[in-house]
Amino acid sequence: MAENGASQETTQVAKHQEVGHKSLLQSDALYQYILETSVYPREPEPMKELREITAKHPWNLMTTSADEGQFLNMLLKLINAKNTMEIGVYTGYSLLATALALPDDGKILAMDINRENYEIGLPVIQKAGVAHKIDFREGPALPVLDLMVEDKSNHGTYDFIFVDADKDNYINYHKRIIELVKVGGVIGYDNTLWNGSVVAPPDAPLRKYVRYYRDFVLELNKALAADPRIEICMLPVGDGITLCRRVS
């Protein structure tokens, strides 16, 4: 019986990893319990609608998980964020979680290279009455950030910055946005456990995109741990999120 149980558990883990769940929990049942007990019953209707729309999109694994969306929404309220930035938007699930958490005069500078994906969620965002908080910019974020850093009046003006974009540029983003977030403000980097691949052996059967970006994620994690300007906390929420509180 023990052997059979172990075999079933191994199969479950293999299936979990194969479908690329937006959770690092090795038990699908436990993750489902979290969703059904804590997340879905309290999920705002606009977020539920956008989550269900996004689930039909072929790139839906790019979206922020529902539990991470809930976490971001509460975090923003706890820190009383008002001026925020998001790098990497996709259909806007995390953007909507942010917009719903901000006061009516709150602002989000949102950047993504694909406006078409953003427009999938835009009708939901508009219906939720929070579109006026969002300044969406289509195109690469680095040129925009460079211009912002050049203007000293932008330094230390952001309460919260969320990065969920091209992992090979995370270090480049950090070099710039650390100047833009205020002392006491927070930066959130998504996917910092990267499908659990950060601890995978060299011969692990990783998907090509997971293997390609793995070293960039490891580089970021090492850099954040050594950066004296921030306090950090890495959490196994979604695909891993690292919160950085600027202290100097």
Swiss-Prot record:
> What is known about the tissue distribution of this protein?
Mostly expressed in petal limbs and tubes, and, at low levels, in stems, roots and leaves.
Q: Where does S-adenosyl-L-methionine bind?
A: T64, E86, G88, V89, S94, D112, A141, D166
* GO BP term, pick one: circadian rhythm
Q: What induces it?
A: Circadian-regulation with peak levels occurring at the end of the light period in flowers.
* Cofactor binding note: Binds 1 divalent metal cation per subunit.
Which Pfam families does the record cross-reference, listed alphabetically?
A: Methyltransf_3 (PF01596)
Chief subcellular site?
A: cytoplasm
Q: Which CDD domains match?
A: AdoMet_MTases (cd02440)
Subcellular location per UniProt equals: Cytoplasm, Cytosol
Question: What reactions does this protein catalyze?
Answer: (E)-caffeoyl-CoA + S-adenosyl-L-methionine = (E)-feruloyl-CoA + S-adenosyl-L-homocysteine + H(+); (E)-5-hydroxyferuloyl-CoA + S-adenosyl-L-methionine = (E)-sinapoyl-CoA + S-adenosyl-L-homocysteine + H(+)
What PROSITE patterns does the record point to? SAM_OMT_I (PS51682)
Which GO CC annotations does the UniProt entry carry? Answer: cytosol
Residue ranges annotated as transmembrane are: none
Question: Please, which domain of life does this record's source organism belong to?
Answer: Eukaryota
Q: Which GO terms describe its molecular function?
A: caffeoyl-CoA O-methyltransferase activity; metal ion binding
Q: Which InterPro entries match?
A: Cation-dep_OMT (IPR050362), SAM-dependent_MTases_sf (IPR029063), SAM_O-MeTrfase (IPR002935)
Its EC number(s): 2.1.1.104, 2.1.1.-
Residues bound to a divalent metal cation are D164, D190, N191
- EC class of the enzyme, as a word: transferase
**The protein's required cofactors:** a divalent metal cation
The cross-references to Gene3D superfamilies, in alphabetical order and at most eight, read: Vaccinia Virus protein VP39
Q: Which family does it belong to?
A: Belongs to the class I-like SAM-binding methyltransferase superfamily. Cation-dependent O-methyltransferase family. CCoAMT subfamily.
Full protein name: Caffeoyl-CoA O-methyltransferase 3
Per the record, the gene is: CCOAOMT3
